[in-house]
Structures are given as structure tokens and as C-alpha cells.
Regions:
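Compact integral membrane and secretory-pathway proteins
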Residues: 1-211
Length: 211
């Protein structure tokens, strides 16, 4: 098994590490803001509540959706011949990413309220993809690569755009300069690697199989 074959899993892990890492750094660990925090935090910002700044709250969860669906799309693709342990690891990453869509202190009743419809739908979609991942492996290369590209593109665009929109307000709230943390850049790097592998990795492997 070539190291290159594991770059899909590595890309997913890098994306999650960046997403869970600091997006706005602070000397006090309790004031560090991660990508995962933002989906809840923006609800309480005065400028967002007043409508002065417009953000799509659920957009901050797109990296989780991209990682989860991406791992499910690739885990059983025949050209890579992943061992069962490797497939299990990729699907475990997919499940962990999906479950991180749950809000803090969630309950089944709370997840059925309009505020969390999209998150509930995202979890259901991601877990369904895990369940049918052997079938997803039969999709043509170009459809898989295009889907990965779309997912990762949205996972960069929505969170980064809206984070930069609210960054001045968060900095004012925390009374410091709003220094960007490493998490944002690592997440973007992981998603870019995923896209690159989606086209070059899948295409090269499947050409060899056809040959």
C-alpha cells in the first residue's frame, strides 16, 4: 500500500485538526475560538443579531460535511485496495465528523426544531453515506472528483467568508487584535489536498486499473 493512497485519510484528518484548532488565537486558552465554536458563537454577536452583519450560520459546519462525505466516497474505491482496517479508519473519521454537527447540550427534541433542521439533515445524509459507502465507490471517477471539489470548495468559501465578516466584532468583544490562528490555514490546506487527490489520485489509479 503506497503512502500516496493514504492522502485521502490524511487530508480528512488535517481538515478536522484545522477545524478544531484555533481560528482566532489568544494567550488565554479559554478565549481561543475554533472553527467548531463559530456555528454557535455567531448567534450571540450583537451585529449578527441586529442584522447589520449577515452570515449563514450553518455554513460553518460545511468542513464537517465535506470530510464525512468525502471519506465515504473514497473508502471502498477498488483502485486503492484499502485494507479493511484502512476502510474502517476512513469511515470512523466520517462518523466522527458527522456527529460533530450536533450542537452543545443537544436532545432529540431540540434537533427537530427549525433552528437545527439543516444540521439534523446533514447528520442524516452523512451517516447514510457511511452506510452505503460500498455503493458510492461505484460512481464514475469524474462524478466523485467533482463532488469532492464542490464539497471542499463550499467548505472553504462559507466558513472563511463569514468568519472574516465577524472577525472585527469578535475582536472587539474579546478586546484584542483578533490574531488569526493556525487552524484556519490547516483546514484550508487539508481541503485543497482532498481536491487535488480527488482529481489526480483517483484518475491515475483508475486509468491503471482500466489499462
Amino acid at each position: 500500500m503506497l503512502f500516496r493512497n493514504w492522502l485521502f485519510l490524511i487530508a480528512g484528518l488535517l481538515t478536522l485538526a484545522g477545524y478544531w484548532g484555533p481560528w482566532m488565537d489568544h494567550r488565554a486558552a479559554g478565549l481561543v475560538i475554533t472553527g467548531l465554536d463559530l456555528g454557535e458563537l455567531v448567534k450571540f454577536l450583537p451585529t449578527v443579531r441586529s442584522g447589520a452583519v449577515t452570515v449563514w450560520r450553518e455554513g460553518f459546519y460545511w468542513p464537517l460535511v465535506a470530510v464525512s462525505l468525502g471519506q465515504s466516497l473514497v473508502a471502498f474505491r477498488i483502485p486503492f485496495r484499502y485494507p479493511w482496517l484502512g476502510r474502517a479508519a476512513m469511515l470512523a473519521v466520517a462518523v466522527v465528523a458527522a456527529l460533530n454537527l450536533l450542537p452543545p447540550a443537544w436532545t432529540p427534541a431540540r434537533m427537530m426544531t427549525p433552528e437545527f433542521y439543516l444540521q439534523s439533515g446533514g447528520i442524516a445524509l452523512c451517516l447514510a453515506a457511511v452506510a452505503v459507502s460500498p455503493v458510492l465507490a461505484l460512481l464514475p471517477h469524474r462524478i466523485t472528483a467533482a463532488t469532492i471539489t464542490l464539497l471542499c470548495g463550499l467548505a472553504i468559501w462559507f466558513p472563511v467568508r463569514d468568519f472574516l465578516r465577524v472577525l472585527p466584532d469578535i475582536a472587539a468583544l474579546y478586546n484584542h487584535s483578533g490574531r488569526l490562528g493556525w487552524g484556519l490555514f490547516v483546514m484550508a490546506g487539508g481541503l485543497i489536498l482532498f481536491v487535488r487527490m480527488g482529481w489526480t489520485g483517483l484518475d491515475g489509479k483508475e486509468r491503471k486499473v482500466r489499462g
